[in-house]
């Protein structure tokens, strides 16, 4: 999808970083131009999501995913640099489109 606020074309993906292609997760600037700290937090979220989706996270798998989602949100909200105005609203729209197109995923 195209979003000027996210820096241009980005793959459709959900909050858990999953794409419409089963087993493919994304993180970092491919999901929108943000700080390196946000990219690292997204990488940890993608990893937690993959482990949980594969059934390898045990009883705490979903908890780890939720913690990683909160970490991404916290890191984004406290970023020293915002590269594009309206990035929060654009992410909300992206995640809504994901839900409408692909469902809740995991």
Can you say where each PLM-predicted feature lies in the sequence?
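FAD-site-proximal beta/loop scaffold in flavoenzymes
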Residues: 1-31, 73-74
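Mid-to-C-terminal Rossmann-like scaffold of FAD/NAD(P)H-dependent oxidoreductases
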Residues: 2-8, 45, 49-106
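Residues in flexible loops and secondary-structure boundaries
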Residues: 20-21, 34, 38, 80
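Short beta-alpha connecting loops at secondary-structure transitions
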Residues: 28, 32, 102-105
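Conserved mid-domain beta->alpha element of the FAD-binding
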Residues: 32-51
């Amino acid at each position: 999808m195209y979003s000027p606020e996210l820096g241009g074309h980005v793959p459709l993906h959900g909050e858990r970083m999953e794409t419409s292609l089963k087993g493919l997760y994304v993180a970092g600037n491919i999901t929108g131009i943000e700080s390196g700290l946000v990219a690292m937090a997204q990488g940890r979220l993608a990893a937690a999501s993959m482990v949980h989706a594969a059934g390898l996270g045990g009883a705490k798998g979903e908890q780890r995913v939720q913690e990683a989602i909160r970490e991404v949100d916290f890191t984004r909200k406290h970023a020293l640099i915002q590269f594009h105005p309206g990035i929060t609203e654009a992410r909300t729209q992206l995640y809504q489109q994901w839900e409408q197109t692909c469902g809740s995923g995991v």
